[in-house]
Amino acid sequence: MNYFSAYFDVIAVAPKGEGWEELQKQQARCIPVKMSRAINPIFDLITLFQLVKLFIKEKPTIVHSHTPKAGLLGMLAAWIARVPIRMHTVTGFPLTTATGIKKQILRFTERLTYACATNVYPNSQKMCDIICSMGIGNPKKMLVIGNGGSNGIDTAFYSRNATQDIKISTFDFTFGFVGRIFYEKGINELVASFIRLQKDYPNIG
């Protein structure tokens, strides 16, 4: 946000909690809004009303949302408030692991999110393909930025010297995982795969 603040008037809207103090260190005006990760119709309606009220007051040119819940409420509120550019980045897709009535609800909410957005940015080509194949998003709105790695990697920042401390050689193949340690992120399958691979390939870490 520090980068964008050099060119735009940036407002960060998020619930208070973990990471809030770090958010306030950014060069942006921070406005707290209560938001629940879980499906909670009454609480979500209150949040939606707060966002609509905020967008009408601030009159932003662009609203950019992340995560399923923030995307649903943010894009719907921006559409109601007639914000001209409504951008949603798809960084989570719980629909793929949900079942029964929950899956139907999530399918509807995802479809509504993409319908309210003017631009949708899946974080990988695979994610884009899934969304389009399920028929819940308009392919004309979809764009995968930088093959899913829009920020890139600063190779000068990450040093290979750290691998020596944990005894990883140049010839070892190392896997990494970034995400919440949660079954919906596929952590169980990932650990099972690591165990299986290590039995056959000793140079995998």
Describe every region a protein language model picked out.
Residues 14, 64-65, 121-123:
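Short beta-strand scaffold positions
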Residues 157-174, 199-200:
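Nucleotide-sugar donor-binding and catalytic loop/hinge architecture
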Residues 173, 177-196:
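A conserved mid-protein helix/loop that constitutes part of the nucleotide-sugar donor-binding site
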Residues 42-49, 84-85, 94-116:
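Nucleotide-sugar donor phosphate/pyrophosphate-binding loop at the beta->alpha transition
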Residues 1-43, 130, 135, 141-142:
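N-terminal strand-loop element at the rim of the active site
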Residues 62, 78-93, 110, 121:
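Active-site proximal beta-strand in glycosyltransferases
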Residues 29-32, 111, 115-161:
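Donor nucleotide-sugar binding/catalytic pocket of nucleotide-sugar-dependent glycosyltransferases
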Residues 65-71:
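Short His-centered aromatic/hydrophobic patch
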